[in-house]
């Protein structure tokens, strides 16, 4: 009986690590297209004043536009995903608070409650950040 409880605890902790990793990585993926956008922004600025570099300037300007719009619309998509995931965490939080099995799940029930609330708050905060940056970009 004791080993079964220990196994359940290990299974739970492995699952929570995967979910926790997803909640930390997902909001930051939107930054990936931003780095090349910054590079091509400065490159097009330098080439703008360079005589005879019209073709290179247009190429850099088009690449900047591509990565900029990818970052902006990617931010909008991630904002929607974050709201969905945060809502799922909120439902899990409510289930843990008001569920019958919360009192019996003493070894990891309260830790799960704190982790779920923290993930919900983090995702909600990142949603507001991405919604603000998307609104400023449009």
Would you name each region that the model predicts?
Residues 7, 70, 79, 104-105:
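Intrinsic low-complexity/disordered segments
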Residues 2-73:
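Membrane-associated alpha-helix detector
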Residues 125-138:
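Juxtamembrane boundary at the C-terminal end of a transmembrane helix
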Residues 58-97:
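Short alpha-helical packing/oligomerization segments
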Residues 89-118:
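Cytoplasmic juxtamembrane regions at transmembrane-helix boundaries
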Residues 22-41, 80-89, 117-126:
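Canonical alpha-helical transmembrane segments of integral membrane proteins
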């Amino acid at each position: 009986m004791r080993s079964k409880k220990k196994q359940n605890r290990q299974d739970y902790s492995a699952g929570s690590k995967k979910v926790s990793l997803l909640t930390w990585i997902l909001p930051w993926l939107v930054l990936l297209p931003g780095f090349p956008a910054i590079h091509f922004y400065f490159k097009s600025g330098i080439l703008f004043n360079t005589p005879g570099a019209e073709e290179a300037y247009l190429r850099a300007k088009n690449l900047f536009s591509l990565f900029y719009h990818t970052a902006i619309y990617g931010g909008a998509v991630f904002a929607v995903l974050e709201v969905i995931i945060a809502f799922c965490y909120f439902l899990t939080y409510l289930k843990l608070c008001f569920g019958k099995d919360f009192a019996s799940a003493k070894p990891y029930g309260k830790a799960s409650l704190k982790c779920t609330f923290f993930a919900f708050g983090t995702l909600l905060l990142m949603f507001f950040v991405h919604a603000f940056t998307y609104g400023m970009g449009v």
